[in-house]
Regions:
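Short beta-strand-centered segments at strand-helix junctions
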Residues: 5-7, 12-53, 58-105, 110-137, ...
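Amphipathic terminal alpha-helices
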Residues: 146-148
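Short coil-to-beta-strand transition motifs
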Residues: 150-152
Length: 190
């Protein structure tokens, strides 16, 4: 067993409860639109605009549930196009990350930090990690054999938790480079 489903993670925002209330009003609760592959994670009906120095990305999805800190995940193409810095980071590693403004129907939030390009990663349960011979924070390479665009992604971080479901996450730039689709599988090649 060395194959893993490869999922494309498009631009999105994780909001804190405080910022959610600023953007949508006091006491506001997120509306589940669609459950995602990771247990307990969901796409919301709510959307916000992400404002950079050059341009605005309108209608960016919010993913729930709320987090401790607001985080904006963009592809490097998105970040460059709107004029924001988006260092490649693991989720939650926000110190020294990019700044932007979020605009919702009831208010605005200016983020001094929080914009990142998510480091490509694989979610695994402890049983998956054992089967793959991996441990939390290992860095592996993954080969994707797409027609005409086969490639090997290096620097893929393994994240292990009993609350995860097995899946690799790449952003839209990476997905396009690999010609990845809905049922794309990757092979850990170390």
């Amino acid at each position: 067993m060395s194959k893993v489903l490869v999922e494309t993670s498009a631009r999105h925002v994780h909001v804190s409860e405080k910022d959610l209330e600023t953007l949508f009003g006091p006491g506001y609760q997120l509306t589940v639109k669609k459950m995602l592959s990771q247990p307990g994670q969901y796409a919301c009906a709510e959307r916000v605009d992400v404002v950079g120095e050059k341009k605005t990305l309108t209608g960016v999805s919010i993913l729930g549930p709320c987090r401790k800190e607001t985080q904006v995940e963009l592809s490097l193409t998105d970040a460059r196009s709107i004029g924001v810095k988006a260092p490649i980071r693991e989720s939650g590693d926000l110190e020294g990350s990019g700044a932007c403004k979020l605009v919702g129907p009831k208010g605005e939030v200016v983020l001094e930090k929080g914009v990142i390009a998510a480091k490509r990663h694989i979610h695994m349960t402890p049983a998956d990690a054992e089967a793959f011979g991996c441990k939390d924070k290992d860095v592996v390479s993954v080969k994707i054999d797409s027609d005409g665009r086969a490639l090997v992604f290096g620097d893929v971080v393994v994240r292990v938790s009993p609350s995860y479901a097995l899946a690799m996450h790449i952003d839209t730039d990476e997905s396009n480079a690999a010609c990845a689709g809905r049922d794309t599988m990757g092979e850990i090649v170390r």
